[in-house]
Amino acid sequence: MKVAVLPGDGIGPEVTEAALKVLRALDEAEGLGLAYEVFPFGGAAIDAFGEPFPEPTRKGVEEAEAVLLGSVGGPKWDGLPRKIRPETGLLSLRKSQDLFANLRPAKVFPGLERLSPLKEEIARGVDVLIVRELTGGIYFGEPRGMSEAEAWNTERYSKPEVERVARV
């Protein structure tokens, strides 16, 4: 299986390297046949190519069967125009690969309730899975804009977008 590795920015390279250690050990133990290729993405790609999701990375992602993605963005690129900020690469990746849902688990394990910011009796037994839609709504809504006196954005979902994420 071909895996495109996009370390990204900030702590992303460190996290993806740790994930690769785990995947390599799993591959060695189970013979999964994983092959990795690293591509610049986000701020690192802006530094190398002038854009957050350059063509070599796009091609590598399209040819891969899986993507291992680190974090994206950081203060270094905050002053860039919106169209070339690291986060725009993330939105382009989601759109190009039709990655429309994100699963965000939140679970408090027994014995760790006291470490939660919630009261222990409230935190006890929490086990929630949040399904987050990634390619519609506020991310890609039009019209959007900003002037000296105001800013605006549009959050719109089509019925098929809602039905699709509801099936996740």
Give the ranges of each region predicted by the language model:
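N-terminal basic/disordered segments at the start of proteins
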Residues: 5-21
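Short catalytic helix/loop segments, enriched in acidic residues and glycine
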Residues: 20-30
